[in-house]
């Protein structure tokens, strides 16, 4: 038996497109020999959907898409994250799709309400474990925050689970993956259950989800790792209830990890909002040079335009460096002098500045003048 992890870059609110991505992933998983595929948390609507979760029609659309998805993937078993509404209550849910229908549904038990999370605003707490039989292996379900505490995993174990499937939308920060490994190893130690951990990938507003999904066996050893910061599919074979060794990856350096997170965040922010590209200011300094490199790696040079806005305080070296940076990365480049704006500023404040010696006040006003044409 093979279990597949679908690490997919979803778009919040684009339910039809997300469902199509899941169908395509299920087809690939089937071709790879998998009979079960696990998605990430709230995969059908994308995470975090925020106040879309306050709309009744949103749940109705998700429910219809879930039924359509079940029919489209008949012959595979899928565990899909989605929002669910029942008797006026809302839940962060995961449903088992089997034989073209919804077979079982689990409701998330632990709702994070700190930092970037505010799930208590939207959802009710689930109370019961969910365990189902797949080809002789009893699989329990947890959703993200559930595994950061002990009770949900222990409840699944008590209900007969022999393996834990965990759907996640766990955002990136530096060294986050190591923290995840430590948390999951603690759940493994407490329950003796291997874990299949599927994480969302992609940028959504200020958040970046790094993916880096994995499988850990009952000893706490990694059996499979998926790449970070990109969509991916991974399959692990199970023999007599034990996951077999799959591909492991070399860890990213801290610098590479941060750079890839920034690049992915920029790319998805631009693309998911439908922007044609990026306009950015080049100063000739290292900060804007790095920003330019991230933009080009995210979108390609054809979607980036760089603007140098020199004033009388700008050194010739800065202008030369800015132009060289733009040429090296093959982006469109223009110079837009802001001295006329500075002169207008000086004229407006001439009476207030009368009798005062020119100092850093005037020079530092350059940043304000540069903002005007950018807007």
Label the predicted regions.
Residues 288-291, 315-317:
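Short glycine/serine/threonine-rich phosphate/pyrophosphate-binding segments
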Residues 253-254, 313-314, 361-365:
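Short, contiguous acidic/charged loop-to-helix segments that flank catalytic cores in large enzymes
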Residues 276-288, 341-342:
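A glycine-rich phosphate-binding loop feature that marks nucleotide/adenosyl-phosphate handling sites
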């Amino acid at each position: 038996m093979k279990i597949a992890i679908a690490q997919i870059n979803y778009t919040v609110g684009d339910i039809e497109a997300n469902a199509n991505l899941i169908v395509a992933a299920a087809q690939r998983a089937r071709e790879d020999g998998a009979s079960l595929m696990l998605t990430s948390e709230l995969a059908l609507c994308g995470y975090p959907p925020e106040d879309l979760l306050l709309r009744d029609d949103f749940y109705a659309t998700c429910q219809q898409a879930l039924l359509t998805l079940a029919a489209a993937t008949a012959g595979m078993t899928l565990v899909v994250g989605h929002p669910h509404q029942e008797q006026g209550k809302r839940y962060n849910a995961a449903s088992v799709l089997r034989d073209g229908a919804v077979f079982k549904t689990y409701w998330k038990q632990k709702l994070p309400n700190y930092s970037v999370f505010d799930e208590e605003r939207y959802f009710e707490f689930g109370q019961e474990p969910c365990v189902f039989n797949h080809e002789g292996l009893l699989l329990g379900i947890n959703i993200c925050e559930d595994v950061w505490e002990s009770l949900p995993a222990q409840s699944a174990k008590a209900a007969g689970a022999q393996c834990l499937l965990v759907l996640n939308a766990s955002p990136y920060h530096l060294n986050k993956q190591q923290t995840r490994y430590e948390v999951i190893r603690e759940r493994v130690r407490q329950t003796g259950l291997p874990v299949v951990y599927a994480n969302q990938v992609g940028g959504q507003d200020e958040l970046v989800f790094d993916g880096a999904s994995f499988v850990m066996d009952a000893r706490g050893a990694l059996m499979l790792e998926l790449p970070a910061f990109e969509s991916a599919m991974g399959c692990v074979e199970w023999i007599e209830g034990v996951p077999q060794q799959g591909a492991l990856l070399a860890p990213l350096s801290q610098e590479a990890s941060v750079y890839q997170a920034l690049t992915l965040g920029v790319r998805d922010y631009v693309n998911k909002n439908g922007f044609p590209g990026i306009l950015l200011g080049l100063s000739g300094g290292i900060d804007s040079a790095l920003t330019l490199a991230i933009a080009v790696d995210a979108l390609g040079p054809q979607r980036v335009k760089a603007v140098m806005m020199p004033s009388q305080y700008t050194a010739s070296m800065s202008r030369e460096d800015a132009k060289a940076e733009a040429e090296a990365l093959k982006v469109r480049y223009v110079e837009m002098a802001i001295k006329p704006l500075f002169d207008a500023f000086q004229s407006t404040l001439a009476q207030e500045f009368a009798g005062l010696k020119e100092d850093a006040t005037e020079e530092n006003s350059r940043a304000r003048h540069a903002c005007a044409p950018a807007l």
